[in-house]
């Protein structure tokens, strides 16, 4: 396993304040964790001129030009997704800064700094798949659902076992989401949402599940979501698939129950190649791919913790065999041994054998395809 921890310079261990780069969703999700450890935010840098001059949680938002003479020796944590991080990283390096010495990504900060400075085992983003059934058959599905040899719903007991195993071994998960297939197809959805909300809500920043909007959840599920502040992320494929009426009905229901939600339409997808045309890479090409991709989402399935949730799905589909180093059997980790539990965090920043054949989500994958194209 290629470990990507232990990259931050020694000075990071002594800090009690940071500068955030980005006043968006990621900062909002992380704010409770920052409060837990009493780390101070000096100010927030943001390129969006409409945010500059305003505040985030009472903290000033300023431009980089206004910030550069105030940074001094303070460390910057970039609060964005991977693609935007690369762009900001280049910008800061062009201005004389050094990655891991002067700044780092939020995922790196969560996994490395919280362990070194606070002794906490924290994860950034974990997905748990609750069903491999779906209402659509997307040719380029990034979970490979149409290519499964056998599809099924996970039972409540299986899902409960997963979350109990993981949450008893880590202190905090910034973003925890339930996926499919189409999660609404699983009759256990309401029960597992309520169980996680009741038992572990204080241990995760954002609790969410992801749907395609083709099925409207029951009122009972909406009430559970409202009670536990559960976020719904809706993937909009209506430009390719005719179901806009269902999407609009779902939107109306979400507004009626005042549910936190995002309805997202992607204009383009990148084809992973697998399983119909898996990528072939030599060692040098693989290293470049890992530099470009480096997904933030880990997987929690079948009582195991996976570096990449997509790699789990590749194996579950019946078309790939993972190496033993690609996952951790959680039952084998002593929940009372914090050093042993830290192996989970180490794997979260690692790699896996599936990377050799997966096109991935990085800038090196330019094999673009239409969104939601059906088989």
Predicted regions and their residues:
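Hydrophobic, well-ordered beta-alpha structural blocks that scaffold small-molecule cofactor pockets
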Residues: 1-117
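Hydrophobic/aromatic residues located in beta-strands of well-ordered beta-sheets
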Residues: 18, 76-78, 176, 207-209, ...
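Short hydrophobic segments within beta-strands
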Residues: 20-21, 45, 79, 129, ...
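Accessory C-terminal segments flanking Radical SAM cores
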Residues: 26, 276-375
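Generic structural signal for small/hydrophobic residues in well-ordered secondary structure
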Residues: 76-78, 130, 134, 303
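N-terminal pre-core extensions flanking Radical SAM catalytic domains
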Residues: 97-150, 327, 331-375
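Conserved alpha-helical substructure of the radical SAM core
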Residues: 109-211, 216-219
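Conserved AdoMet/S-adenosylmethionine-binding subsite of the radical SAM
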Residues: 186-302, 306-311, 316
């Amino acid at each position: 396993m290629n470990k990507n921890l232990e990259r931050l310079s020694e000075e990071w261990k002594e800090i009690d304040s940071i500068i955030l780069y980005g006043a968006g969703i990621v900062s909002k999700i992380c704010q409770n964790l920052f409060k837990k450890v009493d780390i101070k935010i000096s100010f927030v840098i943001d390129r969006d001129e409409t945010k500059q001059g305003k505040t985030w949680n009472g903290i000033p938002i300023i431009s980089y030009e206004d910030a550069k003479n105030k940074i001094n020796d303070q460390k910057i944590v970039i609060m964005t997704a991977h693609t935007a991080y690369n762009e900001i990283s280049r910008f800061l390096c062009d201005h004389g800064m050094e990655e891991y010495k002067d700044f780092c990504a939020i995922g790196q900060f969560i996994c490395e700094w919280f362990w070194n400075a606070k002794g906490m085992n924290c994860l950034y983003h974990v997905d748990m798949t609750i069903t491999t059934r779906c209402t659509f058959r997307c040719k380029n599905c990034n979970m490979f659902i149409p290519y499964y040899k056998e599809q099924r719903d996970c039972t409540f007991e299986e899902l409960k076992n997963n979350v109990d195993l993981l949450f008893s071994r880590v202190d905090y998960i910034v973003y925890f989401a339930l996926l499919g297939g189409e999660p609404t197809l699983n009759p256990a959805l309401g029960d597992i949402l309520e169980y996680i909300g009741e038992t572990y809500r204080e241990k995760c920043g954002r609790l969410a599940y992801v749907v395609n909007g083709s099925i409207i959840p029951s009122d009972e599920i909406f009430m559970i979501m409202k009670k536990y502040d559960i976020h719904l992320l809706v993937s909009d494929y209506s430009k390719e698939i005719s179901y806009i009426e269902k999407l609009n009905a779902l939107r109306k229901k979400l507004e009626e129950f005042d549910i936190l939600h995002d309805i997202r339409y992607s204009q383009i997808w990148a084809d992973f190649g697998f399983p119909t045309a898996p990528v072939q890479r030599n060692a040098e090409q693989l290293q470049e791919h890992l530099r470009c991709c480096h997904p933030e989402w880990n997987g929690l399935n079948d009582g195991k913790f996976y570096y990449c949730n997509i790699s789990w799905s590749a194996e579950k589909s019946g078309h790939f065999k993972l190496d033993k180093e690609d996952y951790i059997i959680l039952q084998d980790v002593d929940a009372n041994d914090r050093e042993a539990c830290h192996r989970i965090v180490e794997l979260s920043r690692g790699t896996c054998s599936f990377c050799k054949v997966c096109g991935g989500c990085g800038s090196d994958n330019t094999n673009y395809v239409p969104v939601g194209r059906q088989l």
